[in-house]
Amino acid sequence: MLDINFVFFHVGDVQQPRLLVKSIRKFNPDSNIYFITDNETESIDGVTDTLRIECDRENLMTSRLNGFSQLKLNKPAVYIDTDILVIQPITSNLFIEHDVYLCLRSHQKDNMITTNYRGLDLSEYSKKSIGEVYPFLACFTYTKNYNFWEDCLEILNSIDKKFHFWYGDQEALRIINDSKKYDMGYIDESIICAVPEISLKRNPPYSIHFKGKKHKKRMIATAEILLGEK
């Protein structure tokens, strides 16, 4: 069983990423954890290294992919969102067959996409489901090296700038998957990074994704039980 590296990008309040790091340390104590952030965000104990970059908080998707590229991590890693708690060991044995693994959306994938989400004009996706438009979640991605993120950043910079604020990472994942440039594998979100609604109905996933502000208190409460601290 080999330990895996973890990478996350975050700016602003660090309560949730601190809990993420503690959960990784509980179940993957020997893993390297890389924190990418701006010059204002507080430091986080327990990470292996911190990369501080110039970030545009109005264009978080661009800053995120730029950070993953600038880290230049030339070894396998899981790139993970910060509203997540790891609840069992995640090892490289999960990722032995392919160079890249994407998190496949399954929860509420048939819901119709909101064409004015966060003020974005997504009218080009009218009458399409969220699963059709964004089949992959950007909350949990495995890559063998940083080249994948350089390509994703190039894609994001080539599309409509409205996606630089939101959905840009998912746009890039769909486009790069369709390009067939990489040897891709897929892991269902219910297995690798489930929302609480799924995680309570089946065998425990590897991690729980407390997506959205409404689940922040739930993440804190779960961490208190899981980690024995807030």
Model-assigned labels for residue ranges:
Residues 41-43, 55-61, 108-110, 191-197:
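A short acidic, often aromatic-flanked loop/helix-cap motif at beta-alpha or helix-coil junctions
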Residues 94-159:
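Conserved catalytic core of nucleotide-sugar-dependent glycosyltransferases
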Residues 15-18, 62, 66, 167-175:
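A structural signal for well-ordered alpha-helical segments within the folded catalytic domains
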Residues 1-59, 72-73, 147, 179, ...:
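N-terminal anchoring/stem segment of glycosyltransferases
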Residues 52, 61-115:
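GT-A fold catalytic core of metal-dependent nucleotide-sugar glycosyltransferases
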Residues 34-36, 78-81, 86, 101-103, ...:
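A structural signal for short, well-ordered beta-strand segments and their strand-loop junctions
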Residues 133-219:
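Catalytic core and acceptor-binding pocket of nucleotide-sugar-dependent glycosyltransferases
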Residues 35-43, 84-90, 190-193, 212:
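Short, polar loop motifs at secondary-structure junctions
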